[in-house]
Structure formats: C-alpha cells, structure tokens
Amino acid sequence: MVETRNGTGTYVKRQISGNYMLNIVPIGDLQFEDIVEVLDFLCLIEDSVAAMAVQRCTQEELAELQAIHKRLIAAKDQNDLEALTNVDVEFHSKIAMITQNSLVVQTYALLLEFLQPVMHRTYVTLGAEEGIPYHERLIQAFCAHDAVSAKNVMGAHAQNR
C-alpha cells in the first residue's frame, strides 16, 4: 500500500510478499532474452500506469515530477550519464508512486532495478537526448490532467526504447 501525505509526497506503507514479486522477473543475471521480456512487459503496462498516475496526481506530486525532470535536464547538460540514468529511473518510479498502487510501485522498483544498467548503456550508445522529449510531453499531459495524452506519450516512449 502507498500513502500520500500533503506537503511531503507519497510513501510505501506496506509491501507485498517478496516471493510474489520475485516470480514476476527471472532471478539472477539478466540475459538478452530476459531484458527483451522485461521491456516487452513494460510496453504492456507503462502507458496505463501513466494514465492512472495523471488521474491521481496532486499538485505537490506534479511539482515533484517537474523537479525531477529539471534534474534530468541538468544531468543531460553536464553529460553526466550516470546521474542521467539515476534520475530517469527516479522519474519513472515517481510516476509509479503517484498511482498509489503498491503492486505498481513494487513492480516498477523491481523492473527498473534490473533495467538500470541497460538504460545507462542506451544513454552511452544513443546519447543523452533519447527520453527527454517524452518526459516533457508527459509533464504537459500531467499539467493538463490528460490521461489519454499521457497514455499515448508513455506508450510511444516505451516502444522507443
């Protein structure tokens, strides 16, 4: 379960059994096929997660998401790919937290932990610009409380990885 506290953000109150979560993604070092499966799974859920988050987002959470995005831009401007990767993970994790759904939050935590090295390699290979336009359009959708737009943008972002 997650809890939203005015002025401080959203917090995980209760976690689902670890054994349940471990069955979602293969344990151990991910092979290429595992990474493809995780990315495919994210493509299935990320757009709906974004739509749900838009519908539940508070002004404070929107401000937090915007602050994370500003840090993402700063990392890109400094060409700090390590920070860029970490902040990108934080951005997607924040969207999961905004849903106020503990299963979404924990699933994202698990999947993003596995994918963080892949995300870093993507930034090294393709450059720091890859996700930023999508993030900017997502924030616009959040500002407009437009779940359909958020779903479309996140779907395109997930497919573009």
Where do the PLM segments sit?
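Amphipathic alpha-helical repeat elements characteristic of tetratricopeptide repeat
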Residues: 18, 32, 43, 63-66, ...
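Short linear motifs at protein or domain termini
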Residues: 1-45, 51, 55
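Exposed, interaction-prone assembly regions rather than primary DNA-binding/catalytic cores
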Residues: 52-68, 72, 80-81
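C-terminal all-alpha effector/ligand-binding and dimerization domain
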Residues: 66-73, 78, 86-90, 106-161
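Short, cationic motifs built from Arg/Lys/His that form the positively charged side of catalytic pockets
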Residues: 42, 46, 56-57, 92, ...
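Amphipathic alpha-helical interaction elements
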Residues: 54, 96-100, 120-123
